[in-house]
Each structure stands twice: as structure tokens, then as C-alpha cells.
């Protein structure tokens, strides 16, 4: 394949940041087709036991996902994000870098999470906002 460049093109030298972490996938995890999981840059990327990651999801570097969490198709999780246990992230949801999502959280389909989410919260929208706190007690 040939490369043809037209006028006013600037090509910059690529800087490579070393990634020393790993991807740790615990027991009973399901990962569907076309998913990408980036290895950690300074710490590991961790997928917790019993988690289900559906088709075409992207999980960036240094992400930690708790146990029994479900990411529906085309979910994108930004770098250094922490997702708790027993969470459900709806189809095509997007999580910004460095977000903390508590345990038992539901993120509505198509939502864009740009703020941390407390335990047992249901959020939806762009940007995602709290709809209801779940109390299982």
C-alpha cells in the first residue's frame, strides 16, 4: 500500500511511553468478540472474577473492574478508572478517564459518565446524572 501526502501535512515523531503493567483476568470472566483491553502502564489492568464484557468494548490502561460486573456491547472505559462489584454498564456507555464507580451501580445505555458514582446508584444521560439510589437493605 502506498502513502500519498498532500499539502500542509505535519508528521510528528512518535513518543512511546513504556507500559510495565499487565492485564490480569480473574476466573470465570467472559470476553466477547472484538474487545480490546490495554495493559497497564504503571499498574495492572484488572478484570474481576465473573465479569462479562460484551462485543466491541474497549478497556484502557490501569482500569480495575470488580467482580460480577457486566459491560454491554460497545462500552468504552477510560484509563485509570475503577468500577466496583456487581455493576451493569449499558450498551454504548462511555466512562471518562480516572472515574470511580461504586458497587452495585447501573449505568443506562448510551450514557456518558464524567463524574464519580457512589454505591447503589442508577445513572443515565449525557452527562450521566443520578436517577435513583438503590437500597437492598
Regions found by a protein language model. Give the residues of each.
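Structural signal for interior beta-strand "rungs" in well-ordered beta-sheet cores
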Residues: 1-124, 128-131
Amino acid at each position: 500500500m502506498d502513502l500519498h501526502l498532500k499539502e500542509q501535512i505535519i508528521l510528528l515523531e512518535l513518543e512511546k511511553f513504556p507500559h510495565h503493567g499487565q492485564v490480569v483476568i480473574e476466573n470465570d470472566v467472559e470476553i466477547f468478540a472484538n474487545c480490546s483491553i490495554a495493559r497497564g502502564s504503571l499498574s495492572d489492568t484488572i478484570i474481576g472474577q465473573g465479569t462479562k464484557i460484551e462485543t466491541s468494548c474497549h478497556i484502557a490502561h490501569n482500569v480495575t473492574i470488580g467482580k460480577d460486573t457486566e459491560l454491554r456491547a460497545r462500552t468504552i472505559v477510560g484509563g485509570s478508572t475503577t468500577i466496583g462489584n456487581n455493576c451493569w454498564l449499558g450498551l454504548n456507555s462511555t466512562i471518562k478517564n480516572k472515574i470511580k464507580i461504586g458497587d452495585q451501580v447501573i449505568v443506562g445505555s448510551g450514557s456518558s459518565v464524567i463524574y464519580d458514582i457512589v454505591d447503589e446508584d442508577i445513572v443515565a444521560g449525557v452527562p450521566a446524572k443520578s436517577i435513583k439510589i438503590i437500597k437492598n437493605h
